[in-house]
Amino acid sequence: MVFTLGSFVLVTVAVAFVSWLKTKGTDETSKDGYFLGGRSLSGLVIFGSLMMTNLSAEQLVGRNGQGYAAGMTAMGWETMCPIALTLMALFFIQKYFKLGISTIPEFLESRFDRATRVIVSFIFLVAYIVTMLPLVLYAGSVAMERIFGITALMGGNCFMATTVMCVALGIIGGIYAIFGGLKAVAVSDSLNGIIFIIGAVILIPVLAFIALGDGSIAEGIRIFATSSPEHLNAIQPADAQPPYIPWPMIVLGCGINHISYWCTNQSIMQRVLGAKNLKEAQKGSLLTGLTCVFCPIFLVAPGVIQFIYYRTVPAVSAGRHQHLPQSDVGLLRRSGSGHCCYGYSGSAHAELCTEGCHHCPYRMLWPDDEPSAVPLPVL
């Protein structure tokens, strides 16, 4: 545990230091410098930032919980991502770049009027504070609390442990956003993405298969493929009930939802609009779409592996969010991989550090004041 915690802290400091080195020359006294990283982001940086924003803490914890309870049908939520990202690269980004906007509400002003921009800006801001951020903080705190055993350190008080982790994640995410702007957030997201790939995409599935096969990865894969075929069925009938996903919903429901999320969500588009040019923005979007094809492997499969390992399905509403951190805690502790645990906190930071939502209301209230790195991140 000491080595795990130590490596976690070391990686956290290293990522912060590298992010500072990469951003210290950026002019953050201008609107574009602070909110859009000086419009200097490359395609690879955008790709890493988009992936970490999408694979936020509530996705990591929630999708694996769904995989545990319902099987591979949970991958239906991710199926339409590549299509939505392709549409974003081919159509939406070109329109946004042509208009030269820095936030989505600015597009609404050009399409409708100033009042629409103000109303939508405040709706986005309130929705982000009330609905999105609490989920991100809670899911991230659950994962970190279970992996590091914070409850035991606080005398068994789970509420206090979760609260402390929520506050810690919020403070760290706020530091990145306030003092670094979007470029620092994007650079740290890219580094987090590398760490996440090492941990969530490679290490955790491999260790899980080894545990399932009692030391043999080949045996683990065989057991995974043969022990519970119904849990590997990703296509459900049209009248399937929750937590299962009816197949028509994947196209008619998830498809529309993904277009809305990827093409109009400020936390997504802020990264894309910070690109140095249209080509880099499209490159980052298409790379993200390609990677999303493989998301079910590390978002859903670990939950299915845990179901096969324990051979029991919990009540659908009874603590399903605990399954991912519980299954990972033993794997990560055995490997001493605190740097992989950092992937969970990094995914939460990526979602927390979206400053652009407050930019539009700020400009509406003080139209003559060019923002000079005003520290008002949505936290």
Report residues per predicted region.
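Membrane-embedded helix-loop-helix hairpins and adjacent transmembrane boundary segments
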Residues: 1-379
